[in-house]
Amino acid sequence: MHIFDELKERGLIFQTTDEEALRKALEEGQVSYYTGYDPTADSLHLGHLVAILTSRRLQLAGHKPYALVGGATGLIGDPSFKDAERSLQTKDTVDGWVKSIQGQLSRFLDFENGENKAVMVNNYDWFGSISFIDFLRDIGKYFTVNYMMSKESVKKRIETGISYTEFAYQIMQGYDFFVLNQDHNVTLQIGGSDQWGNMTAGTELLRRKADKTGHVITVPLITDATGKKFGKSEGNAVWLNPEKTSPYEMYQFWMNVMDADAVRFLKIFTFLSLDEIEDIRKQFEAAPHERLAQKVLAREVVTLVHGEEAYKEALNITEQLFAGNIKNLSVKELKQGLRGVPNYQVQADEHNNIVELLVSSGIVNSKRQAREDVQNGAIYVNGDRIQDLDYVLSDADKLENELTVIRRGKKKYFVLTY
């Protein structure tokens, strides 16, 4: 299957410039292309993964990727479809984020092997030395204000106000494309659908300044079946950095995907063949309660992002927590699996009677409720049911001398730390 057709079949093409010309270019030989990532945080997230994996698919088809991390544009801030001006970060902060993102990208693209090995670039390398006068004379003169104002990303900000700094962002992104074309013969840019205006600024600059044709592919912004986006600005980002989103949390994210999204996400986020995905779809639709599509999705993406061992650990944590087998997990695994649950620091002189602790830790509101819960068998300490009102937590209940896990009912977990 032609790589363009595969991308379409997987739902990875939202918009392109000249589809016929782009198809022809991809058929005739190796195409050099780039995707840009602005360092707006110290980690990329699942929203970025769509473009990253699209870039990897093109590399596997024999084309050459350039991964641009925006050390310069990250200092400015992209206004595209944002309601307000971004907060400007210091150069030291942005430089640190650049290094983090470059490290993450190296997990997905092959930077070492073959004539189409990926190349990492930073646009601070060319913007850091250009003077303001040169910027206006050599770049700015190719963009009319009318053209810049016509971009949807700018139109949406005109009424609320947009600074010249952010207004000029599209010129900077356009110049990225121009530089990569001149230095590396890059003729294709890949990015999110919200970047269309900035990306076509690059094709316009190429046409006007160098009389060359550039191509653009935008990938869709991913939403669930209800139309809800996931990403940093929506406050529900699933980060690629395991310190920000653990492999277990990422595993749970995919396991909780709605049935209506599961097969579509298999096409977008995994390298399973379309035939394999079709087989999974048939099995999934025959027995949706078994959640086969979600299980495969969780396995494939967690393994892709964090490695097979992290996937196995996430699966084990899931199975042990579901069964209530707390003692089968290490403290490291428990911290990963119970991140975000209520945590209470037990004081050295605090009475460790179970009823007293249930109240002082905030697990229940009163001693009466605590006594009822214990007597009714609703309280578990490290997976063991406690029904003795006089039970006192001892050192034996401190897992690795660090924490105790309390469960109330079937699913409400609490962690006591010492």
Swiss-Prot record:
Give the CDD domains listed for this entry: S4 (cd00165), TyrRS_core (cd00805)
Into which EC class is this enzyme placed?
ligase
Q: Which residues form the S4 RNA-binding domain?
A: 352-418
Q: Where are the transmembrane segments?
A: none
Q: Which GO terms describe its biological process?
A: tyrosyl-tRNA aminoacylation
Q: Where in the cell is it found?
A: Cytoplasm
- What is the top-level taxon of the source organism? Bacteria
- The answer on whether this UniProt entry bears the keyword Repressor reads no
User: Is ATP-binding one of the keywords?
Assistant: yes
Locus of motif 'HIGH' region: 39-48
What residue intervals hold the motif 'KMSKS' region?
229-233
Instruction: Cite the EC number.
Output: 6.1.1.1
What does UniProt give as GO cellular component? cytosol
Where primarily located?
cytoplasm
User: Which residues does the record give as L-tyrosine binding sites?
Assistant: 34, 169, 173
Please write the reaction equations for the catalytic activity of this protein: tRNA(Tyr) + L-tyrosine + ATP = L-tyrosyl-tRNA(Tyr) + AMP + diphosphate + H(+)
Check the record and name the Pfam families matching this protein: SYY_C-terminal, tRNA-synt_1b
Its biological purpose: Catalyzes the attachment of tyrosine to tRNA(Tyr) in a two-step reaction: tyrosine is first activated by ATP to form Tyr-AMP and then transferred to the acceptor end of tRNA(Tyr).
Provide the assembly information.
Answer: Homodimer.
The Swiss-Prot or TrEMBL record describes its family as follows: Belongs to the class-I aminoacyl-tRNA synthetase family. TyrS type 1 subfamily.
Question: Which HAMAP family does the annotation name?
Answer: Tyr_tRNA_synth_type1
* PANTHER family documented for this protein: TYROSINE--TRNA LIGASE, MITOCHONDRIAL, TYROSYL-TRNA SYNTHETASE
Q: What is the name of this protein? A: Tyrosine--tRNA ligase
Q: According to the entry, what is the taxonomic lineage of the organism?
A: Bacteria, Bacillati, Bacillota, Bacilli, Lactobacillales
